[in-house]
Amino acid sequence: MSECGCFSATTMLRICVVLIICLHMCCASSDCTSHDDPVSQDEAEKATKLKLGSIALLLVAGGVGVSLPLIGKRIPALQPENDIFFMVKAFAAGVILCTGFVHILPDAFERLSSPCLEDTTAGKFPFAGFVAMLSAMGTLMIDTFATGYYKRQHFSNNHGSKQVNVVVDEEEHAGHVHIHTHASHGHTHGSTELIRRRIVSQVLEIGIVVHSVIIGISLGASQSIDTIKPLMAALSFHQFFEGLGLGGCISLADMKSKSTVLMATFFSVTAPLGIGIGLGMSSGLGYRKESKEAIMVEGMLNAASAGILIYMSLVDLLATDFMNPRLQSNLWLHLAAYLSLVLGAGSMSLLAIWA
């Protein structure tokens, strides 16, 4: 059984590179709106210093956010068998759900409803909702097909050994047949659940990473100090809470230390990397955020990212946990989990005022 389940770090890196190339194609495109007022040299230098500071700030915020749940695995109170664990997962799911609905999807609708696209196909069709729907359906296909593939592979690999055990036990004592078959079933169920958690964590990371690169490039390409300052603070909290949600899913995947560190690092560096790319584009590559190409690419990517996050939060995180018999049999734990969900979604919603 592959430890990574569906995607490797190399695959994620390739997706990130393709994303950067798509946005790079938006460089040197003509604006469909009037150009911004020229920025003075002094103001440009101050903006550059703020952007460099934001790289360090977002790196720390994202790193701390994604690391807390991973470190928390070593804390007894946060072990899977404890009630607090359900509350932490509900909070993380609320953060991810809000990110998709409140932060990303509205941005996609705004970009793809731009007056600049009125004379294009995008201006005559609700592409934001359409792409988000396709993205959610695609995530469902990846989720189910990948889980089914590894489940069938696991059954195939263990079928032979199971038959041998049955024959031997029948020769020795008939009562042993049921016991070994039941244990094998439990092991298979546990392995399938673990594979599913790994697939969930990696597909979820792809959706978050796409959004992180886009917001990083937007900040890096901005030349307004009045815009950069509030964005620095808001995006720091944004990365921290997104990191909490992703870190919680990675911790459940129970992967090797190397894979866990790679996934946490990959998330932490994407927003700072996006800022660096945006900084380079605004400095010498002629990036125009309001060109038709940039608007369409950003809108489509945001819509796809929103579809992934909404599906994953509702289906793979919330539905799974809130249908858990342990949660449903404990009224106070059930209410506490809902409260955590509301707090997670509410905290992330407040950031939409500034970010």
UniProtKB/Swiss-Prot annotation:
Q: Which GO terms describe its cellular component?
A: plasma membrane
Membrane side Cytoplasmic: residue ranges: 73-83, 146-198, 251-260, 316-334
Induction (UniProt):
By zinc starvation.
For this UniProt record, give its keywords in alphabetical order, as a comma-separated list: Cell membrane, Ion transport, Membrane, Signal, Transmembrane, Transmembrane helix, Transport, Zinc, Zinc transport
| Spans through the membrane | 52-72, 84-104, 125-145, 199-219, 230-250, 261-281, 295-315, 335-355
Q: Which GO terms describe its molecular function?
A: zinc ion transmembrane transporter activity
Q: Subcellular location, in the record's words?
A: Cell membrane
- Residues spanning the signal sequence: 1-28
Tissue expression remark: Expressed predominantly in the roots of zinc-deficient plants.
Q: Kindly report every residue range on the membrane side named Extracellular.
A: 29-51, 105-124, 220-229, 282-294
A Pfam family of the record is Zip
Additional info?
A: Zinc uptake is inhibited by copper and cadmium ions.
- Function description: Mediates zinc uptake from the rhizosphere. May also transport copper and cadmium ions.
What's this protein's family per the entry?
Answer: Belongs to the ZIP transporter (TC 2.A.5) family.
Q: Which NCBIfam families does this UniProt record tie to the protein? A: zip (TIGR00820)
Q: Which PANTHER family match?
A: ZINC TRANSPORTER 1 (PTHR11040:SF181), ZINC/IRON TRANSPORTER (PTHR11040)
Q: What is this protein called?
A: Zinc transporter 1
Q: Which organism is it from?
A: Arabidopsis thaliana (Mouse-ear cress)
